[in-house]
Amino acid sequence: YVNYGCSTRKSLYQLVDFFSLFYFRFLRDSSFRNLLYWSKLQRTPRFYAWAGVSFEILAMNHIDQVKQRLGISGVSPQLYSWRSKSDAGAAERAAQIDMVIERGDNTINLCEMKFSESEFAINKDYEKILRNKIVRFMEETKTRKSIQLTFISSYGLQRNMYSGIAQNEVVLNDLF
């Protein structure tokens, strides 16, 4: 993926083949002698890390459906990834945007993608992280375009006092 605001030299490369991702995460170094291997693997940090990356790749592979759900199929969007240029003293301010959709109507969708087994709840701390991502993106890219936070998740957002930070929402069913 081309990094927003950078040349193609600074592109981000990601393994996007689902089987290879699964193989390198779980099969390459494992022993199948343990009959409970797969049962014990579920609900572990290792499993959730793999599921999160796989969900992001799934959403990126279904960008046409994402654009359709957002109602922007006809505004010639460009896709990017983005990572802040964090300096050594500002690690807490570092930010990464899973997918940036730059639209032809002077609007940018900053897409945050999350795998979860139920509705995803944004809490006070996570809202602060999301606001930091938006601010860092605007500061570092110096964009004057309108910014919309788009949340792409398995089952949608749980409505609460913090969920309003997302102007758009895409769920797993929208991808198929």
Residue ranges and their predicted role:
Residues Y1-N3:
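Beta-hairpin "wing" of winged helix-turn-helix
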Residues G5-F176:
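A cross-kingdom feature that marks ATP-driven nucleic-acid transaction machinery
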